[in-house]
Amino acid sequence: MLQALVERGIAPDLVVGASVGAINGAFFAGRPDRAGVESLAAIWRGLRRGDVFPLGLVGGFLGFIGQRPHLLAPDRLRALLGRHLPVARLEEAKVPCHVIATDVLSGEEVCLSSGAAVESVLASAAIPAIFPPVRIADRQLSDGALASNTPLSAALGLGAERLIVLPTGFSCTLKHPPRSALGMALHAVNLMTTRQLVVDIDRFCSTAEIVVVPPLCPLNVSSSDFSHSGQLIDRAAKSTRRWLDEGGLSTREVPGALRPHAHHKWHPGQHTGPVHDLT
């Protein structure tokens, strides 16, 4: 999506992101040009699940028996962000960058506009029960998707009058629920935040001009599977270019791909495979 927008010379006045949107948003805000977007795409093309989600029996067991409130250590994700984020602090970004996290005690949406970029983004991407919350300024912060995966209210509060939303969408052609706890958690978060996005668009459409770039559909790749990232990036770029050619920036409709739907119908008695696997 981002590639196609940058190719057309579309440049934002500010960037607001939560969860994976915080990762992409912070990188793009630091390098808001075509070369930066190509570098970001190259990073995603080279990622594998173990680079972000280092699954292990010991960590999973400790989380399961209540010895720690998360399944995975954030070390690999922290190292990945440290290697690739182009700025050390959010306020150093070339385009104002705002990262949304959630206070795990109050549920409050927290907008981070300054401070250490790695820790801020790590907090926004800390999926509850998967990664531990991140302490910033005496607050325990977790995945911004809990408060608002597409933080329209935060962007409006920062003065935005026109919003271009780049949603992830959700896996709508899976033949069975994800088999791993991680995959199921990510799929559930995607469903939840996609539904909330539609609600937020309806809520704020009279307040600001909101344009939503249609996500890929059909989509048959699990959120925890990075092996198809290159294909998805290419598909999204092609789809977004076509959408732009058809006057997409002038549309105000919620894409059908964001509404509840599925391309695979489950039938009673159909085997779905195990859903209890913790790996």
Question: At which residue positions do the language-model features occur?
Answer:
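Patatin-like phospholipase
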Residues: M1-A18, I23-T279
